[in-house]
């Protein structure tokens, strides 16, 4: 019934098992990947033919987490998995990026890769097994695919690279780097780091690529024993006559368009060229009694011509699209405190890319609670990236963030995390929002720069400025050019684009996407060195506007006071059913967070209210000391004495014999409920019960006499 094939290989400290032939047999390819209780099922299905008129490659990758994988039932009313989480979206992108360049040019059949996480060991992140599984499923499917790829996670612990670390090991690592590639080439890098040098980062990439060969070899073995026949597919023959006609009609116009330095004017000119070429070809076809050529085909030829033109200009040492040389960063403008009521804000403009970045400070209650498959956790730092259609001068849909926005936001967040103050030094929750108001390339890196500036403007004591720069690389016939601070057009036309963020001391985030084979370690070294040069230039411009974090928080930011109490006293602050803390927050207008270790954080925009809440908490939690004198209040009277409250929640017995220096016949003759009386604590037993005395500090008669003196002084003379 089943023709099950299994391959096993050692991957770092883990054993990886690849299985096919038992589950999801109707898919084009299906592989079950197991790594020490983490199990993922990767499937791929491809349409047998492309849709008519299809002019792009419709690849979709969906990574899906099921809560049963962690032995849990989904929360919420419906008790069912809902929209993709941020983790699912980011992992889907992580898998998509190295796979997409390996499909042959001209292959437009729809391909869907779906990865389900079926079981999770909290120590083993499913993302690397998912990438290996997707690669293996494609490799055995017979679909045209120039793979397989391998994938590896690399940590850097105590000066050593570590392959596929566990979640616990990552906590002590200075690097979290994911690299994917084929036997001969690196295709994708995604990493965050604790301000490491270019050499260490590149070493991690090379180490990961060397180690992933074990996964690639295992996939080759799986294909040999379980692979399906390769498709008999070949790309459609190129219409050389049409290419020649389009080239002749467009060459002059395209060359003129790319002499225009301003984006909007250049785009307008290019649209005119496209329209003129289409009209000219239609006219020629009509004169020959033929149908006009397909518009999509003509547009694709024109795009190829644009790419060839721009690439050749750059490789020949001519100026780039906007007139710069390969190393120059576009002009930078920084304006701080743009929004009067925001806690911190910065308008960061680099050429035709602009980000309005806003920092907001909140309390512990504002932390994001993330119900992740590998365990729930709280996040005190959020960065949200938004790019509306007007940023590129277009109309479009406004709504929930798209995959691209989520990915760019995560990259910017990774860049800034290493410079954040420790939670014990700065107890605020921080939210950064980057609103991209103009875009012509490198908007995620503008968000990094703006985020760093906005936090400093808000008074967040980050350890250093962080700047980011987007780089491009063009490689042809042994010649290559590295481009600093690429434009949007250069992003599409290059062979490698990578983004580097960091401080003066080192890299905090690195993202690389390589579209071709042949980019060597030496080329990457040159590219990273040039990126550092660009980053340092940008950092210099940022320092000119603001050299360090402001010493004062915004007047509109909450003020925080921290006190430490005995953890056993927490119940006194909370009160029965939460009544005490609820009354405290309502009456003082503060937010109060209590940790299990007894740390209490009081937050309020009004510092006076925060101090009042602090005073009342100190009263609630103060320890009563034997021998100390307190101003008490009579709670109730007994035949043999009175119960007197000495502190909120603490009361004791004032025996009738300890009230006065004379014998009292009736307690009601000397005390009333609610009466204020000074008492001394003379004993506390092992259960915390208190014995009080007024007689020990002079007796009730002395207190009554002292109270009568000001009363007599106030009586008017006869």
Curated annotation (Swiss-Prot):
What's the chief localization of this chain?
cytoplasm
Record flagged with keyword Nucleotidyltransferase: yes
One Pfam family, short name: RNase_PH_C
Coiled-coil ranges per the record? none
Q: What reactions does this protein catalyze? A: RNA(n+1) + phosphate = RNA(n) + a ribonucleoside 5'-diphosphate
**Enzyme class of the recorded protein, top EC level:** transferase
Which CDD domains does the UniProt record give?
KH-I_PNPase (cd02393), RNase_PH_PNPase_1 (cd11363), RNase_PH_PNPase_2 (cd11364), S1_PNPase (cd04472)
Question: EC number(s) of the enzyme?
Answer: 2.7.7.8
Which keywords fit this entry according to its UniProt record? Answer: Cytoplasm, Magnesium, Metal-binding, Nucleotidyltransferase, RNA-binding, Transferase
Q: Where in the cell is it found?
A: Cytoplasm
Q: Which domain of life is it from?
A: Bacteria
Provide the GO MF annotations for this entry. Answer: 3'-5'-RNA exonuclease activity; magnesium ion binding; polyribonucleotide nucleotidyltransferase activity; RNA binding
Residues engaged in binding Mg(2+): 491, 497
Residue span, S1 motif domain: 627-695
KH domain: residues covered: 558-617
Q: Which cofactor does it need?
A: Mg(2+)
Q: Which GO terms describe its cellular component?
A: cytosol
Q: Which GO terms describe its biological process?
A: mRNA catabolic process; RNA processing
Q: Which SMART domains match?
A: KH, S1
Q: Which family does it belong to?
A: Belongs to the polyribonucleotide nucleotidyltransferase family.
Q: What does this protein do?
A: Involved in mRNA degradation. Catalyzes the phosphorolysis of single-stranded polyribonucleotides processively in the 3'- to 5'-direction.
Protein name as annotated: Polyribonucleotide nucleotidyltransferase
Lineage of the organism:
Bacteria, Pseudomonadati, Pseudomonadota, Betaproteobacteria, Burkholderiales
This chain is encoded by the gene named pnp
């Amino acid at each position: 019934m089943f023709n099950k094939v299994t391959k096993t290989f050692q991957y770092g400290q883990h054993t990886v098992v690849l299985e096919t032939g038992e589950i999801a047999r109707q898919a084009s390819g299906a592989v079950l990947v197991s790594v020490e209780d983490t199990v993922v099922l990767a499937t791929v299905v491809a349409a047998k033919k492309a849709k008519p008129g299809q002019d792009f490659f419709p690849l979709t990758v969906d990574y899906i987490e099921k809560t049963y994988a962690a032995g849990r039932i989904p929360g919420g009313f419906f008790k069912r998995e809902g929209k993709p989480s941020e983790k699912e979206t980011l992992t889907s992108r992580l898998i998509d990026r190295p796979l997409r360049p390996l499909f042959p040019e001209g292959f437009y059949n729809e391909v869907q890769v779906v990865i389900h996480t079926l079981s999770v060991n909290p120590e083993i992140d499913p993302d690397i097994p998912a990438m290996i599984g997707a690669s293996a499923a494609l490799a055995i499917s017979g679909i045209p695919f120039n793979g397989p790829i391998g994938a590896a996670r690399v940590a850097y612990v105590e000066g050593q690279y570590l392959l596929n670390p566990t979640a616990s090991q990552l906590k002590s690592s200075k690097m979290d780097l994911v690299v994917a590639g084929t036997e001969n080439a690196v295709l994708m890098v995604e990493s965050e780091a604790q301000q490491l040098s270019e050499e260490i980062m590149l070493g991690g990439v090379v180490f990961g690529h060397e180690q992933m060969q074990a996964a690639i070899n295992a996939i080759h073995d799986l294909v040999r024993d379980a692979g399906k026949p390769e498709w008999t597919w070949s790309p459609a023959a190129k219409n050389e006559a049409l290419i020649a006609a389009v080239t002749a009609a467009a060459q002059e116009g395209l060359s003129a368009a790319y002499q225009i330095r301003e984006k909007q004017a250049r785009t307008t000119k290019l649209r005119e060229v496209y329209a003129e070429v289409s009209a000219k070809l239609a006219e020629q076809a009509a004169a020959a009694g033929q149908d006009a050529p397909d518009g999509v085909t003509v547009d694709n030829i024109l795009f190829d011509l644009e790419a060839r033109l721009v690439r050749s200009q750059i490789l020949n040492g001519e100026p780039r699209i906007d007139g710069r040389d390969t190393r120059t960063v576009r002009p930078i403008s920084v304006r701080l405190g743009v929004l009067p009521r925001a806690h911190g804000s910065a308008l960061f403009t680099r050429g035709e890319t602009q980000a309005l970045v806003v920092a907001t400070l909140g309390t512990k209650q504002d932390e994001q609670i993330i119900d992740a498959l590998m365990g729930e956790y709280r996040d005190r730092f959020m960065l949200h990236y938004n790019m509306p259609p007007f940023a590129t001068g277009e109309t479009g849909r406004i709504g929930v963030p798209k995959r691209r926005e989520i990915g760019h936001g995560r990259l910017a967040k990774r860049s800034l995390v290493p410079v954040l103050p420790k939670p014990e030094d700065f107890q605020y929750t921080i939210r950064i929002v980057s609103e991209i108001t103009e875009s012509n390339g490198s908007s995620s890196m503008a968000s990094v720069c703006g985020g760093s500036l906005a936090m400093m403007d808000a008074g967040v004591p980050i350890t250093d400025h962080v700047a980011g720069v987007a780089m491009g690389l063009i490689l042809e016939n042994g010649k290559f050019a590295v481009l600093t601070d690429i434009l949007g057009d250069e992003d599409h036309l290059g062979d490698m684009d990578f983004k580097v963020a960091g401080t003066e001391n080192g890299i905090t985030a690195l993202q690389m996407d390589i579209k071709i084979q042949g980019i060597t370690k030496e080329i990457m070294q040159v590219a990273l060195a040039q990126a550092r040069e660009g980053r340092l230039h940008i950092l210099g411009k940022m320092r000119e506007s603001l050299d360090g974090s402001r010493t004062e928080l915004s007047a509109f930011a909450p003020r925080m006071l921290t006190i430490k109490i005995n953890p056993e006293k927490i119940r006194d602050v909370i009160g029965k059913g939460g009544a005490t803390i609820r009354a405290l927050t309502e009456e003082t207008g503060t937010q109060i967070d209590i940790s299990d270790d007894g740390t209490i954080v009081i937050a309020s925009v009004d510092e006076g209210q925060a101090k009042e809440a602090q005073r009342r908490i100190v009263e609630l939690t103060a320890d009563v000391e034997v021998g100390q004198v307190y101003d008490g209040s009579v709670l109730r009277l007994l035949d043999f004495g009175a119960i007197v409250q000495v502190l909120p929640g603490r009361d004791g017995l004032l025996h009738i014999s300890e009230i006065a220096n004379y014998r009292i016949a009736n307690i009601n003759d000397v005390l009333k409920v609610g009466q204020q009386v000074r008492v001394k604590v003379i004993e506390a037993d092992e259960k915390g019960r208190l014995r009080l005395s007024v007689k020990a500090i002079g007796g009730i008669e002395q207190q009554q006499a002292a109270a009568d003196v000001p009363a007599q002084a106030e009586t008017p003379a006869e």
